[in-house]
């Protein structure tokens, strides 16, 4: 038999499934031990009637005890339909699995009402097993609630679940056991399973017969219904002793055996069913010699916690000493049950008799109050005519309830089925009842006692007969157990043999398939060899036939060979001729290659010449464009000169009229000023001729350097413009942030911050104007070259007629200085590029300031002229001086204003970043120049275009755009 080693705590009962012998319908023990025998109407309250609390507790306690003590209780065949089979603590795994399968099949194939009854009985039995097994009931109830849906709703047949109550104290007390995975493989049932199934079906057939027998026995013993009550009370007390203790009677005596039993419980070693049955028979035979007194203590420790009913046992001592047993025991160490020591059941048909029976005993007050309460709360009727008594208390009672010597001698052992009587009847049988001072015993009480004694005697006789039958059953059980072992070993050997044979068959099959495959391969190989042999034979026969043909073919080939040799000689001669011809062709090809290379070289030279000519053509086109621009500029200048001439003529007429209306002496002023004016006109014409010569020279220089400087100027302009914009943005952003921070920190320096901002704005505008300067440099070069060309043309010719008025000629007073400056700049340009740029910028600025200085003289209104207090002669001389001085001062001061320190500008890069006419360079020098000009009367008009304009001469000034057109 297999063992399921389940660990549990010292206070938890071991829940076992009943042994297979319990299911034989022929054993008489199951008639006594079946709860339906003593309580035929102890049924499931599945209708609308609600049972009372005490009745449900009593019936549930009885079921719990009948399940929890498998040693002293054998179950009827209808036990298989009850839920106690689902308690998983059995040591015999095979029988437990068989019972699980049987209940599952009953739930699967039974009627819905039977299934619902089975499930309800499971929950009721596991939920009302008693207060001492709360943890076990909790875990088993949880396990059943987890398993019930699987039982009811699974359609396929399943193997046993194999869910055992395993684990230590903490697992049993605190955790719900998890269900193990189910096995769905279909297997043949083992011997135990088939045996249990056959017993189950036989038990179902004989169940109705047993119920009829039980009802007949109840009717025969219906005269003393209390006898059943007392008998069952003793039985339940006997069960309470051995509750949860599979190894109770293994020890002899003493505390050491008790410790050993506890140790065995902790280690989880559980004896098999055969050992327990043998020990039962031995203890029954020698019960008087070997009573395990220590088993009581062990059953107490295994049963649960001590109940508060121990002082009740002490209070019952005045009733009299307990009956003398044939051996010594320790009554104080014996465990007490969970409730009162009265194993008293009452029926609602005899409430008065029970109450009168309790009265003569001087029991303590708590027992009386409890019995009185039970009297006034009888369980309701459930439609049963002949009812035995219900359980007023939970079914566990005190172990050492006093009883008669006969009953103690028969039923003193723990595992016998003799059931001791409770306290009142045993006292009446052993000694006379003590007389109470308040009450006297009536004849009814004595009659009840006599009837009880008669019932006790009848029951003891029946018990003795049943003991004999039980002994026979034990012997049969031992034999059956041996048979079971042998059959199990045979079945195991058979299973191993089946496994080995199946394994051998599989190996044989594999070898057979392997050999068959090898045979097929060899057959194929043999077939291939035969085919090859046949082909070889055919080839050999064909070669012998071909030998004769080869001889004839050889003679034919010899004749052909001679012919081929003759043809070969002819072809060699032709080949030599072709080689000579090919050499001639190669020489001709080389000659043609040389001619082709020469032609390609000539083509390359022509292409280069073509590029040069195209470049000359482009230059000519550019010069033509410049010529057209110059012509347009000359036309514009002529128009401007004409306008100036008309304006000067008007001014002259105005002066003449003023002179006529004025005093007499100034009339001689024009006569005196005429030679001076003619001299000024001559000087201006000479200056014009010099400027034209310079223009031709500058045009030649421009033609030489325009191709070189064009790309460099464009790249430099783009790079400097980009760099200047990034620097200006960076400087403006940073300086604005810093200045704003300083304005917050130092409010007294707001003026300094504003000045810094103005300087930054000025720098930004300067950098924007720098790009314009580069463009102006290019235009200056063009004008200088054109002036050189024109000067070369007009040198041989005489002086051209003056197209300008004397006022324009007066503006060319410093021609000698300007020509010397430009000539010196030209010599420096030939030496170094830096001086070329400086000279060109100086010349441009000189021309600009010359034009700007002469322009304010032109648009002077007659009103401003009338406001002059001077005479006509003095005014004309002033004009002449102003023109000459303006031109001279502008050419002289231009280098001072815009080139204050030439040594501080070492390279062209510095000039590009800081332009020559930037306000940074102009600002301090301009102040000095203005201060110098303010001291002299003529220099103020030259500096008035910078921002300090006089009210007399600077009102209608020409715009910058018109001056640019004049320069072009």
UniProtKB/Swiss-Prot annotation:
UniProt feature, compositional bias: Polar residues: 152-164, 177-187, 726-738
Which Pfam families does the protein's record reference?
Angiomotin_C
GO (cellular component) term, any one: bicellular tight junction
Q: Which residues carry this modification: Phosphoserine?
A: 253, 281, 307, 731, 804, 816, 840, 912, 918
Q: Where is the composition biased (Low complexity)?
A: 203-224, 853-878
User: Which residue intervals make up region (Disordered)?
Assistant: 152-258, 285-343, 721-742, 785-834, 853-956
Entry comment describing in which tissues the protein is expressed? Expressed in exocrine glands, including pancreas, submandibular gland, lacrimal gland, parotid gland and sublingual gland (at protein level).
Instruction: Tell me one GO biological process term.
Output: hippo signaling
Q: Which UniProt keywords apply?
A: Cell junction, Coiled coil, Phosphoprotein, Tight junction, Ubl conjugation, Wnt signaling pathway
Membrane among keywords: no
> What are the recorded GO MF terms, alphabetically?
identical protein binding
Q: Where is this motif: PDZ-binding?
A: 965-968
Q: What does this protein do?
A: Inhibits the Wnt/beta-catenin signaling pathway, probably by recruiting CTNNB1 to recycling endosomes and hence preventing its translocation to the nucleus.
The record's similarity note reads:
Belongs to the angiomotin family.
Name listed for the protein in its UniProt record: Angiomotin-like protein 1
* Annotated organism of origin: Mus musculus (Mouse)
């Amino acid at each position: 038999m297999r063992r399921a080693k389940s660990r549990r705590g010292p206070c938890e009962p071991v829940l076992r499934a009943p042994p297979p012998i319990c299911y034989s319908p022929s054993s008489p023990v199951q008639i006594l031990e079946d709860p339906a025998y003593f309580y035929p109407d102890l049924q499931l309250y599945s209708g609308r009637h609600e049972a009372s609390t005490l009745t449900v507790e009593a019936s549930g306690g009885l079921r719990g005890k009948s399940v929890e003590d498998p040693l002293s209780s054998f179950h009827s065949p209808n036990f298989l339909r009850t839920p106690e089979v689902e308690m998983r603590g059995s040591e015999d795994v095979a029988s437990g699995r068989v019972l699980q399968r049987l209940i599952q099949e009953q739930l699967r194939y039974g009627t819905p009402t039977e299934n619902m009854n089975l499930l309800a009985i499971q929950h009721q039995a596991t939920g009302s097993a008693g207060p001492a097994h709360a943890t076990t009931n909790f875990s088993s109830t949880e396990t059943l609630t987890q398993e019930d849906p699987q039982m009811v709703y699974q359609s396929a047949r399943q193997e046993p679940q194999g869910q055992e109550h395993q684990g230590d104290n903490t697992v049993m007390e605190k955790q719900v056991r998890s269900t193990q995975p189910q096995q769905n493989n279909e297997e043949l049932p083992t011997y135990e399973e088939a045996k249990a199934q056959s017993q189950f079906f036989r038990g179902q057939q004989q169940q109705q017969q047993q119920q009829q027998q039980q009802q007949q026995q109840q009717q025969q013993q219906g005269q003393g219904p209390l006898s059943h009550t007392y008998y069952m009370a003793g039985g339940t007390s006997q069960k309470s002793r051995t509750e949860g203790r599979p190894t109770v009677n293994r020890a002899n005596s003493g505390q050491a055996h008790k410790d050993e039993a506890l140790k065995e419980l902790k280690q989880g070693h559980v004896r098999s069913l055969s050992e327990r049955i043998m020990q039962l028979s031995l203890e029954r035979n020698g019960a008087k010699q070997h009573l395990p007194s220590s088993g009581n203590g062990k059953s107490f420790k295994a049963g649960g916690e001590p109940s508060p009913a121990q002082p009740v046992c002490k209070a019952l001592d005045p009733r009299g000493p307990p009956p003398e047993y044939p051996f010594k025991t320790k009554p104080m160490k014996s465990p007490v049950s969970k409730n009162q020591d009265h194993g008293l059941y009452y029926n609602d048909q005899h409430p008065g008799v029970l109450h009168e029976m309790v009265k003569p005993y001087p029991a303590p007050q708590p027992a009386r109050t409890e019995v009185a309460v039970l009297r006034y709360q009888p369980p309701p009727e459930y439609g049963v005519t002949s009812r035995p008594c219900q359980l007023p208390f939970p079914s566990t009672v005190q172990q050492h309830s006093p009883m008669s010597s006969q009953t103690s001698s028969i039923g003193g052992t723990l595992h016998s089925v003799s059931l001791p009587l409770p306290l009142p009847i045993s006292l009446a049988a052993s000694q006379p009842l003590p007389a109470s001072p308040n009450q006297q015993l009536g004849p009814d009480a004595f009659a009840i006692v006599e009837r009880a004694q008669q019932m006790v005697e009848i029951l003891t006789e029946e018990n003795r007969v049943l003991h004999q039958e039980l002994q026979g059953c034990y012997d049969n059980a031992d034999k059956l157990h041996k048979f079971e072992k042998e059959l199990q070993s045979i079945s195991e050997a058979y299973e191993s043999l089946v496994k080995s044979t199946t394994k051998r068959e599989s190996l044989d099959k594999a070898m057979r398939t392997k050999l068959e495959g090898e045979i097929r391969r060899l057959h194929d190989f043999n077939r291939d060899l035969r085919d090859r042999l046949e082909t070889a034979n055919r080839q050999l026969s064909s070669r012998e036939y071909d030998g004769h043909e080869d001889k004839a073919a050889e003679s034919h080939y010899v004749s052909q060979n001679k012919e081929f040799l003759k043809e070969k000689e002819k072809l060699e001669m032709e080949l030599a001729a072709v080689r000579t011809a090919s050499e001639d062709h190669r020489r001709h090809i080389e000659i043609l290659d040389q001619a082709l290379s020469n032609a390609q070289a000539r083509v390359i030279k022509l292409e280069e010449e073509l590029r040069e000519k195209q470049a000359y053509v482009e230059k000519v086109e550019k010069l033509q464009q410049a010529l057209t621009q110059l012509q347009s500029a000359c036309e514009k200048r002529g128009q401007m000169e004409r306008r100036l001439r008309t304006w000067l003529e008007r001014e002259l007429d105005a002066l003449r009229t003023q002179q006529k209306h004025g005093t007499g002496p100034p009339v001689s002023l024009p006569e005196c000023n005429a030679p001076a004016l003619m001299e000024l006109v001559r000087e201006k014409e000479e200056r014009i001729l010099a400027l034209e010569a310079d223009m031709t020279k500058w045009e030649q220089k421009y033609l030489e350097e325009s191709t070189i400087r064009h790309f460099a100027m464009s790249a430099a302009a783009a790079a400097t413009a980009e760099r200047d914009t990034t620097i200006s943005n960076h400087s403006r952003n940073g300086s604005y942030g810093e200045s704003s921070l300083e304005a917050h920190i130092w409010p007294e320096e707001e003026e300094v911050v504003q000045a810094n901002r103005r300087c930054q704005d000025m720098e930004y505008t300067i950098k924007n104007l720098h790009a314009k300067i580069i463009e102006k440099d290019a235009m200056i070069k063009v004008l200088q070259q054109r002036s050189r060309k024109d000067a070369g043309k007009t040198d041989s010719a005489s002086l051209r007629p003056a197209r300008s008025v004397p006022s324009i000629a007066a503006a060319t007073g410093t021609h000698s200085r300007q020509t010397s400056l430009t000539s010196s700049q030209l010599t420096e340009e030939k030496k170094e590029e830096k001086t070329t740029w400086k000279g060109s910028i100086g010349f441009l600025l000189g021309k600009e300031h010359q034009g700007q200085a002469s322009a304010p003289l032109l648009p002077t209104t007659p009103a401003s002229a009338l406001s002059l207090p001077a005479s006509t002669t003095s005014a004309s001389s002033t004009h002449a001086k102003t023109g000459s001085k303006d031109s001279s001062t502008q050419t002289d001061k231009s280098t001072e204003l815009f080139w204050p320190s030439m040594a501080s500008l070492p390279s062209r890069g510095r000039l590009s970043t800081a332009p020559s006419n930037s306000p940074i360079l102009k600002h301090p020098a301009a102040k000095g120049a203005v201060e110098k000009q303010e001291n002299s009367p003529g220099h103020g008009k030259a500096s008035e275009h910078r921002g300090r304009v006089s009210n007399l001469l600077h009102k209608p000034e020409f715009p910058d755009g018109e001056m640019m057109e004049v320069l072009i």
